[in-house]
Amino acid sequence: MKKTVVIGAGFGGLALAIRLQAAGIPTVLLEQRDKPGGRAYVWHDQGFTFDAGPTVITDPTALEALFTLAGRRMEDYVRLLPVKPFYRLCWESGKTLDYANDSAELEAQITQFNPRDVEGYRRFLAYSQAVFQEGYLRLGSVPFLSFRDMLRAGPQLLKLQAWQSVYQSVSRFIEDEHLRQAFSFHSLLVGGNPFTTSSIYTLIHALEREWGVWFPEGGTGALVNGMVKLFTDLGGEIELNARVEELVVADNRVSQVRLADGRIFDTDAVASNADVVNTYKKLLGHHPVGQKRAAALERKSMSNSLFVLYFGLNQPHSQLAHHTICFGPRYRELIDEIFTGSALADDFSLYLHSPCVTDPSLAPPGCASFYVLAPVPHLGNAPLDWAQEGPKLRDRIFDYLEERYMPGLRSQLVTQRIFTPADFHDTLDAHLGSAFSIEPLLTQSAWFRPHNRDSDIANLYLVGAGTHPGAGIPGVVASAKATASLMIEDLQ
């Protein structure tokens, strides 16, 4: 019996496979690595657990919906723990902001920066909530297959001033530069430059205020495992170490999926959660549609890459918050260099993940696991030798953290590893080593983004960061909902 094939067991691929299997469509999930999760890979070392990728869950309802439509309860598969504060934001001046969901507490902290910005923040939150209603709840999981779909959304996008950038939008309401940074950095979580990404992405703030920030007990990998178990409980099949080499096309339909090990899967439909550029360039590079799409996609602007440093310490550093944003001395200038620069900047801003604050089980007793990441240019802009640059940047980051945030860090090191743009390219098959696929510019969003269903190869579908609506766990899970709606309609 032919089965529907989903390529890639990242969050998008898993969510799509669950929706298809729950709808009665026999589905096989092909994952090239030895574990599911895609970017949400997990490493274990000397009793430490390291989530490799996404760590911020802001829409638990989208995940719960996957279990509910399958007639199951999410809490029987994975438990989500609340994160408080959502983030601690730190500046080199010594100023800090604990961003939490308590309005009175948050406004009291805003007053310390600029009393006039309390009212401005209230107006910004109302604006963000309006964008959230339109951009996420109404349009986030609707496939934009024709330009008419874009035109229908146009009036509301104009009303919300979607042509403005995230930073411009925040600045309409808020005066203090620290607070402008605090409420504009969110687009970086999905690969967007706050100074060029559409103000639609201010919806992330409302999303967090609506449902909170959560972390899976046992780490993000525990959520991946729960989703895999749900899929297999429904009768789905998952194949690991299954690298797809080619999509065989006959009469403008994918008829077979060929693996690198020689196996062949006959199929009625294929959805790719693989890198969108390489889906067309590598898997369909022999076909005119693949060549045409790949050439067009290679002209698009890609999001930044990341340098990630994982480390385990024999001290818990309980003074830290779960999520800490460490702003460097520059904001606009540094971000410009991250997105357009041809070299590493002399400074950096960091995201520090301290999951043992919420779940101490991720490290041996008295210890803690961490990761810290620095946004950096992708390989297309900065083709650096990361075998040389990686250890040097690691040492700079360790020095910075030890001086400002984690006294004694180097003497407490038990284990460490780095993951560079070269690893994004080589291990994750990410075009140019981009961490978030196509940059979320307004001219690369919705209909302008690769469509959830290909317009020429009738049974080829896309899911994940490279299609609508975009990157981040809420984005790729929403893309799975959009793509599933098309596939279920086409296949049933």
From Swiss-Prot:
Source species, domain of life: Bacteria
Pfam families named in the record: Amino_oxidase
Record-level Gene Ontology MF annotations: oxidoreductase activity, acting on the CH-CH group of donors
Biological-process GO terms, alphabetical: carotenoid biosynthetic process
Residue positions binding FAD: 5-38
EC number assigned by the record: 1.3.99.31
Similarity comment: Belongs to the carotenoid/retinoid oxidoreductase family.
Biological role: This enzyme converts phytoene into lycopene via the intermediaries of phytofluene, zeta-carotene and neurosporene by the introduction of four double bonds.
Protein name, as recorded: Phytoene desaturase (lycopene-forming)
